[in-house]
């Protein structure tokens, strides 16, 4: 199945861990980053296949900071970790920028925390920014903003962040590159009977029992965090591959359909997963009523909702809240994430996007609800 899932994937989140990026803490591994950059460029440019959108989630800031500060052991004091992250992020971003630029690609540094993705407005802002970067052909390089968080450094990991980014942009696949070849039924270093797991369902509860253990002194994630990340990614319909990051041409071979590493398959299609997520996790905050033309475009063509088609706004809501879209008879057509708060939406009713700046003092998205953030009701 890996052949079809990765071969058909058009939007891919790639996560690399500290032990790979830093060669077990001995500074950034320039050779490895050069190789990943070359492969990412081939994917983005469509060399030998379709063009793909790629997001890199990269650890390594703390490890690089430790090297620059002359520390051989990872400190336990939280503010020293934050200082190391601040120092190391400079080198990490510069390395990716240099290597991607050598391949003719632009890059963008994006620092996120779990809180950014838990807040609806910041979630929507982050999503819009990342999708714009992808549209421009830029490779976002994402890391956790370790300098301003605490729990994420102590207990978190970039495997989880990679999964959350896959959720955020509705990626087709998450590729976790690690220093292991994939998942085994037991630790192969201790159990000679351990068998390699080529494929499993991402939600299989037996996987966590197989993946016990902890991370290295450089990074914090072990195989268990990758299993949990795969389950999270599957929540938005993304399947996950866990593979050895130093496998030659690993990204190119995966996207050509070669079976490398462990494939953890999402059991729910992307559109259905998105609908279920909105139904289960987001509370309805308000509603807008639309005219006949807008209702038809939503129902029949799955178009975005433009303010010019809105005739009324109900309730008080903020940007990023879930609102219902109703026709003139009050029947619910769809639900989606609002790009504008209720007060702004009332000003924009029946107005073309060319008037937004005059009415609001700024001009952002032309849509009230973008089609990517909209789910039709009733199936």
UniProtKB/Swiss-Prot annotation:
One of its GO terms (molecular function) is ATP binding. One of its GO terms (biological process) is L-proline biosynthetic process. The keyword Metal-binding does not apply. InterPro entries: AceGlu_kinase-like_sf (IPR036393), Asp/Glu/Uridylate_kinase (IPR001048), G5K_ProB (IPR041739), Glu/AcGlu_kinase (IPR001057), Glu_5kinase (IPR011529), Glu_5kinase/COase_Synthase (IPR005715), Glutamate_5-kinase_CS (IPR019797), PUA (IPR002478). Pfam families: AA_kinase, PUA. Keywords: Amino-acid biosynthesis, ATP-binding, Cytoplasm, Kinase, Nucleotide-binding, Proline biosynthesis, Transferase. It comes from the Bacteria. Belongs to the glutamate 5-kinase family. Catalyzes the transfer of a phosphate group to glutamate to form L-glutamate 5-phosphate. PANTHER family: GLUTAMATE 5-KINASE, ISOPENTENYL PHOSPHATE KINASE. This is Glutamate 5-kinase. The gene is proB.
């Amino acid at each position: 199945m890996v052949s079809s899932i990765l071969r058909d994937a058009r939007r891919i989140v790639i996560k690399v861990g500290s032990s790979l990026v830093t060669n077990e803490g001995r500074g950034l591994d320039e050779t490895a980053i050069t190789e990943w950059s070359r492969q990412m460029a081939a994917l983005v440019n469509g060399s030998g296949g379709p063009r793909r959108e790629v997001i890199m989630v990269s650890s390594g800031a703390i490890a690089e900071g430790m090297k620059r500060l002359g520390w051989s052991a990872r400190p336990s004091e939280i503010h020293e970790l934050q200082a190391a992250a601040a120092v190391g992020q400079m080198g990490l971003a510069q390395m990716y920028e240099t290597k991607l630029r050598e391949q003719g690609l632009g890059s963008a540094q994006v620092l996120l925390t779990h809180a950014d993705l838990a807040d609806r407005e910041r979630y929507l802002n982050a999503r819009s920014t990342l999708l714009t970067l992808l549209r421009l052909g830029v490779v976002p390089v994402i890391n956790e903003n370790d300098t301003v968080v605490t729990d994420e450094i102590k207990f978190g990991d970039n495997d989880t962040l990679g999964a959350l980014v896959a959720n955020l942009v509705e990626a087709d696949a998450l590729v976790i590159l690690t220093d292991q070849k994939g998942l085994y039924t037991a630790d192969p270093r201790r159990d000679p009977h351990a068998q390699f797991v080529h494929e499993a369902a991402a939600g299989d509860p037996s996987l966590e029992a197989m993946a016990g253990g902890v991370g290295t002194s450089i990074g914090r994630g072990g195989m268990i965090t990758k299993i949990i990340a795969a389950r999270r990614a599957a929540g938005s319909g993304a399947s996950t591959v866990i593979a050895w990051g130093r496998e030659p041409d690993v990204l190119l071979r995966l996207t050509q359909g070669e079976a490398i590493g462990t494939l953890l398959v999402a059991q729910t299609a992307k559109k259905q997963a998105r609908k279920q997520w909105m139904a289960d996790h987001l509370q309805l905050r308000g509603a807008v009523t639309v005219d006949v033309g807008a209702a038809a475009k939503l129902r029949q063509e799955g178009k975005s909702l433009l303010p010019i088609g809105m005739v009324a706004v109900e309730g008080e809501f903020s940007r990023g809240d879930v609102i219902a879209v109703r026709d003139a008879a009050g029947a619910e057509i769809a639900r989606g994430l609002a790009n504008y708060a209720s007060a702004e939406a009332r000003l924009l009713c029946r107005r073309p996007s060319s008037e937004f700046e005059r009415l609001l003092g700024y001009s952002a998205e032309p849509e009230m609800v973008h089609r990517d953030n909209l789910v039709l009701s009733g199936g």
